[in-house]
Amino acid sequence: MDRICLRCADAALLEPLEEAARELGLPLDMDGRPVWLEPGGKGLRIDPRGDAVQVCYGTRAAAFRALSLLPETLERQDVFLQSPRFTLNGVLVDASRNAVPKPETLYQLIRRCAAMGLNALFLYTEDTIELPDYPYFGYMRGAYTAQEIRKLDDYAARF
């Protein structure tokens, strides 16, 4: 795949898009072929014809989904259209008992879910959240601190 340069009408979306693109192994380069991402419509439209790739997305999830579709769409040189079937689409991670993923693992999962066009990630926890008033709640098990949960939530909101 040729090198690409992401351009986005929403400046706050550009950095998370670049993170997700790196996660997917897309070759980013300031001198690469421009990929213009602009909000509009209800679904997703990718037009690879011309000097620049035009991406029109209806939701943030669609903007990230466009990244995972770029290699095939660029190869085929054909317009791609997709409409969402659900307003909420995501995964539930079992973070209970002895199966508590590290926050770094969840950050990676958030980026990958975004690239698939998913817009929700739920954590199923039982006693794996630290409660300062109850020091033995979840004793001897992995647990998320309130700060870790807040950071995960803030990170996910960017995607």
Region locations from a protein language model:
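Contiguous, structured surface segment used for ligand recognition
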Residues: M1-F86
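Feature activates predominantly on carbohydrate-active enzymes
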Residues: R49-F159
